[in-house]
């Protein structure tokens, strides 16, 4: 198990995230996450841990125009803004009280490959507005920047039960490496 890393850690690996959306190794995750979003495009999609904006590009191509990307990595945000000039991106940390207060006015959240990186994942999720629609993804494999990983999709539900409502949830398992048995779990849910 790894440790929670500062923004600079992610900045040093930005090159591997500069691949165009169409060739991204996370493309399947992005496509499933977009499919699991609420059908209405009236609400702003808040993408926490937006990285280089590849998911934002998919949303734009699908007709979404209300989007806010948040990341604490300056390098990732610079690329996200360059890649998606029509969307808004801000620098922020999930532990920043001003960011948490700002998020209270939104109702649709996406956290792709975020929760495994933060120590206080439950506290952060608990701070989001009740009744919000959410799409989350987490891996079943370890990394030096992962503070946790989940061996099975049921472990995800067990960890966040009580904070997130998974009733009626669609659960998607994406195999990222057959040889290594790596998977990413994508789930839609509601904040309790």
Language model regions located:
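A short SAM/SAH-binding and catalytic strip from SAM-dependent methyltransferases
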Residues: 108-119
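C-terminal alpha-helical "lid/dimerization" subdomain adjacent to the S-adenosyl-L-methionine
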Residues: 140-151
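Conserved N-terminal segment of class I S-adenosyl-L-methionine
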Residues: 1-102, 112, 122-125, 129, ...
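Conserved beta-strand signature within the Rossmann-like core of class I S-adenosyl-L-methionine
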Residues: 132-141
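Short glycine-rich, flexible loops that bind phosphorylated cofactors or substrates
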Residues: 117-118, 123, 143
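Conserved acidic residues
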Residues: 43, 107, 132
